[in-house]
Design a protein with these regions (language model features):
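Leucine-rich tandem repeat or coiled-coil scaffolds
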Residues: 1-404
C-alpha cells in the first residue's frame, strides 16, 4: 500500500481510495486475487480509470504470487489495457485469471490483449463480457486462440461480435486443446441463416474438451436448434448448455429431447425465455424419464408453459431421481400445478433451494410464490455458489501451465 502511494506521488496521480482499501486488506503473499470492482453493492466506490491502472500495474510488477485480478465494472479503456498487457508479458508472471467485464475496452484494446496473450503461458481465464470490442476485436481473439494453447475460459457476451468473428471463434475452438468454457452470448447477428450453428455443430462433433457453452440471445430458431442437436448427439464432453433468450419453440425442443434420451453427459440446461410451451415441456419430460438422460438441473422459466406441460415435468421428476433442480417461474400456475410442486417440496423430492417457487395456502387453495433462486451461471459452482465441482471434474487441467 505504501509503495502504491509512493508511485502515485512520483507520477503526480491522485490516490484512489478504493485501491488503497483493497491493498490494505490484502495480506496474503501467495495465490493472491485482487478484487477491485466498481460495483460495490452496499456503498459507492471510486472506479478505476487508466491512470489508476498505470499506478496499480507499477506496484504489481514487483509483487509475486498474484494469480487473480478482478477489475470489472470500472472505467478502463484501451489505454489501460496497454498497462495490463505489460503485466501479462512479465517474464515471471503468475496471473491466471483476468476479469475485465463491463469496462470501456474497444477493438484496439482487444488487439493489444491478444498480442500479449500469444506468448503467455499462465493466463487460464479471460473475461471481456460487456466491452464493445466489435467484430474486428472478435477476429483478433479468434487469431489469438490459434496460437495460445493454455487459455481455458473465455467470456465474450455482450461484446457486439459480428457473424464473421463468431464463426472464426467457433472454428478456432474446433482445434483448441484446453478451452473448456466459452460464452458468446448476445452478438450482433443480422443474418437469419444461422450459419454459426452449422459451424458450432462441426465443433461439437470433434471437440472433446468443451464443458460449458453459453449461446444466449443468439436469435436461435428451431432450425438452429436442429443443427445444434446434431453436434450434441455425438459430443461426450459438454456438461452445461445455455440457450436462454432465444426463439426456440416446441419443434426445436423435440430435437434436443431426442438427444437427451441418449446423451450421458449433459447435466445442466438453461432454456429460460424461449417459447417451448406445453408440447415442448412434454418432450422434455419424456426425455427426462429415459434411463439414458443425465440432466440434473433444468430452467424453463418464462416459456408460456401451461398446466399440462408443467404437470408432465413434475411427473418426470417423480419417475426419475436424476433431475434435482427445476426452475419454472413465469409460466402458467394453475392450482393443479401448485399442488404438484407443493407435493414435491413437502415430500423432500425437491429441495426448497433447488427451485424458484414456494407453495402456500390461502382459504383452502394452493398458490405458488416466487423464490429468488436461479440456475447457477457456471458449471464449476453448485446452486449456492460455493462448491467447486468444476475443479474436481477437470482435475489437473485447471492447474496453470508452468511458464516457459
Amino acid at each position: 500500500m505504501e509503495f502504491y502511494k509512493a508511485v502515485c506521488a512520483k507520477y503526480k496521480v491522485k490516490i484512489n481510495s478504493h485501491v488503497v482499501e483493497v491493498l490494505q486488506r490484502t495480506t496474503a503473499t501467495e495465490n493472491v486475487t485482487l478484487t477491485i470492482t466498481g460495483n460495490h453493492r452496499l456503498r459507492p466506490v471510486q472506479r478505476l480509470d487508466d491512470d489508476d491502472i498505470r499506478m496499480l500495474v507499477q506496484c504489481l510488477q514487483i509483487k509475486q504470487g498474484l494469480t487473480g485480478l478482478d477489475l470489472k465494472f470500472n472505467n478502463i479503456t484501451d489505454e489501460g489495457v496497454i498497462y495490463l498487457a505489460e503485466l501479462l508479458q512479465k517474464e515471471n508472471s503468475s496471473l491466471s485469471c483476468l476479469d475485465l467485464m463491463f469496462n470501456d475496452i474497444l477493438t484496439d484494446g482487444a488487439k493489444i490483449l491478444c498480442s500479449s496473450l500469444q506468448g503467455n503461458r499462465t493466463l487460464l481465464s479471460l473475461r471481456l463480457s460487456g466491452n464493445k470490442i466489435g467484430n474486428k476485436g472478435g477476429m483478433h481473439l479468434a487469431k489469438m486462440l490459434q496460437e495460445n494453447d493454455t487459455l481455458q475460459e473465455l467470456e465474450l457476451a455482450d461484446c457486439d461480435l459480428g457473424i464473421q468473428s463468431i464463426i472464426a471463434l467457433i472454428i478456432s475452438m474446433k482445434s483448441h486443446k484446453t478451452l473448456h468454457r466459452v460464452d458468446l452470448s448476445r452478438p450482433l447477428l443480422f443474418s437469419h441463416l444461422e450459419e454459426w450453428a452449422v459451424h458450432c455443430t462441426d465443433m461439437l462433433v470433434v471437440n472433446c474438451i468443451m464443458v460449458e457453452l453459453h449461446l444466449a440471445k443468439m436469435g436461435m430458431t428451431d432450425t438452429g436448434m436442429q443443427r445444434l442437436a446434431e453436434g450434441l448427439r455425438l459430443n461426450r464432453s459438454l456438461r452445461y448448455l445455455d440457450v436462454r433468450c432465444n426463439r426456440v419453440t416446441r419443434d426445436g425442443i423435440r430435437y434436443l429431447a431426442e438427444v437427451l434420451k441418449q446423451n450421458p453427459t449433459l447435466e445442466i440446461i438453461d432454456l429460460s425465455s424461449n417459447r417451448i410451451e406445453g408440447e415442448g415441456a412434454k418432450y422434455l419430460s419424456e426425455a427426462i424419464t429415459c434411463p439414458g438422460c443425465s440432466v440434473k438441473e433444468l430452467s424453463v422459466t418464462r416459456n408460456n408453459i401451461k398446466a399440462e406441460g408443467l404437470l408432465a415435468l413434475t411427473q418426470a421428476m417423480t419417475a426419475n431421481k436424476t433431475l434435482t433442480h427445476i426452475y419454472v417461474w413465469g409460466n402458467h400456475k394453475d392450482e393443479p400445478v401448485c399442488k404438484a410442486f407443493r407435493d414435491l417440496l413437502s415430500s423432500g423430492r425437491l429441495l426448497p433451494q433447488h427451485t424458484d417457487v414456494s407453495a402456500y395456502e390461502v382459504d383452502g387453495h394452493i398458490y405458488l410464490a416466487e423464490v429468488f433462486n436461479a440456475l447457477r451461471r457456471h458449471y464449476r459452482t453448485d446452486s449456492s455458489g460455493t462448491n467447486d465441482t468444476y475443479n474436481s471434474l477437470l482435475g489437473d487441467r485447471l492447474k496453470p501451465t508452468a511458464s516457459t
